[in-house]
Amino acid sequence: MKRMIALDGAQGEGGGQILRSALSLSMITGQPFTITGIRAGRAKPGLLRQHLTAVKAAAEICRATVEGAELGSQRLVFRPGTVRGGDYRFAIGSAGSCTLVLQTVLPALWFADGPSRVEVSGGTDNPSAPPADFIRRVLEPLLAKIGVHQQTTLLRHGFYPAGGGVVATEVSPVASFNSLQLGERGNIVQMRGEVLLAGVPRHVAEREIATLAASFSLHEQAVHSLPRDQGPGNTVSLEVESENITERFFVVGEKRVSAEVVAAQLVKEVKRYLASPAAVGEYLADQLVLPMALAGTGEFTVAHPSCHLLTNIAVVERFLPVRFGLIETDGVTRVSIE
């Protein structure tokens, strides 16, 4: 019997990433774990609907036995079984993030006995989670370089707080992992601004695009008007395509916040990324830790290692026989497998 790994949910940033990473790694390695203090660092601690959906999805895919899988629970025991490929559907029942549920279960399906399709309904444009377009246009091309073949499709948008969105991913077992080397971003090739609207006046998008264009030379500007029943909602994105990597940044519009202020938040975030020669943005860095650890090799550079990133690394090192090295030089941190 494999040893039970004990995790403290309050460590590091004290959020849901500890649980999601632990679920992924437990499914992959077959190691059971117990976690206490789930989301202890949040205003509303314990399992919310999206976290509970991730737990139940993981349990279904690997036929795990679980204790503590209920709303508000701050303690969970997870004993995994064998990961099985198949056609899975999960409903969050709120505007909780579809992509964070997918992020939990997809890595395990890289090791399944056959191809899989996973469909999740809930929120797709959530201020605290990567949207589906980030997964499709930024993460999945990098995963392909590592040897992971998965394809995410956004079937219907679901804005916070209403939800109602649907995201599906098709994934195949990985034959072998490759090393990802992202030391340098390279020169910028082009920048693209994009606005999504649902039940929001078009002039909002025009003002947001104008704010982006005042700070950056945009090679493309796009406004996509969605059916009103998918809203109300508004998301502004800016994609930076460089020689070695494409990064995408986004801000979700809020009620009583002007279009100019929303877009200015995005401008600030992109300028912070471009001010450093680091290849990877803060949020993408979190997503690369697990696949890089599974490959057992690779490196990337990031301007500042976030608490989220450091917490994720700590959890990965509990489950896998790898060690990460972080070396800071001239304001850039190089993250690599030692």
UniProtKB/Swiss-Prot annotation:
Gene3D superfamilies: RNA 3'-terminal phosphate cyclase domain, RNA 3'-terminal phosphate cyclase, insert domain. ATP binds at Q103, Y283, L284, A285, D286, Q287. InterPro entries: RNA3'-term_phos_cycl_insert (IPR013791), RNA3'_phos_cyclase_dom (IPR023797), RNA3'_phos_cyclase_dom_sf (IPR037136), RNA3'_term_phos_cyc (IPR000228), RNA3'_term_phos_cyc_type_1 (IPR017770), RNA3'_term_phos_cycl-like_CS (IPR020719), RNA3'P_cycl/enolpyr_Trfase_a/b (IPR013792), RPTC_insert (IPR036553). It is found in: Cytoplasm. Its EC number is 6.5.1.4. GO terms for biological process: RNA processing. It comes from the Bacteria. It catalyses: a 3'-end 3'-phospho-ribonucleotide-RNA + ATP = a 3'-end 2',3'-cyclophospho-ribonucleotide-RNA + AMP + diphosphate. It is an enzyme of class 6 (ligase). One of its GO terms (cellular component) is cytoplasm. HAMAP family: RTC. Belongs to the RNA 3'-terminal cyclase family. Type 1 subfamily. Catalyzes the conversion of 3'-phosphate to a 2',3'-cyclic phosphodiester at the end of RNA. The mechanism of action of the enzyme occurs in 3 steps: (A) adenylation of the enzyme by ATP; (B) transfer of adenylate to an RNA-N3'P to produce RNA-N3'PP5'A; (C) and attack of the adjacent 2'-hydroxyl on the 3'-phosphorus in the diester linkage to produce the cyclic end product. The biological role of this enzyme is unknown but it is likely to function in some aspects of cellular RNA processing. This is RNA 3'-terminal phosphate cyclase. The lineage of its organism: Bacteria, Pseudomonadati, Pseudomonadota, Gammaproteobacteria, Enterobacterales. The gene is rtcA.
